[in-house]
Amino acid sequence: MLGEVNRLISSRGLDAMTTAAVVAYYREENVAKVSYAGHPPVLYRRAAEKAWSFAKPQGRKGLNNGPPMNIPLSVEPDTPYGQLTIPMTIGDQLFVYTDGIIDAPSPGGEPFGLARLKDALDANEGASLSDLKSAVLETLNHYTEKELSHDDVTLIALEIC
């Protein structure tokens, strides 16, 4: 799907790019399938575990080492986008977010980053999805010492039922 969207956007001749993540859950197979186009990695937490893990996309491998993956949309018209498969069971959770979260700067200019995001999620084990999102935003606002306004900030938290 991302390949087709990429070709469509690229054909418009716009001097712009964007990121995207597609997450689909297949109940019959008990898996989530994730594809990235320049997007930060989804986090997942198994119901039986306390810590969150990154569903890491493959980086750009180069011309002779296979197809590029996780390239933003509209950068290369014929980019083949890969897909990660995450086995899921009841109670497992997924956390999808935009780069506005990890790029949010401290007053000194240091980005919030992936490690702080994971730490914020890990620190709120057992929280409802709504409380989990609120805790991440509260941690982020405390880190930046202000309400976020520099970039888009979107959080999606899902639990397999």
Predicted regions, residues:
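Conserved subregion of the PPM/PP2C metallophosphatase catalytic domain
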Residues: M1-C161
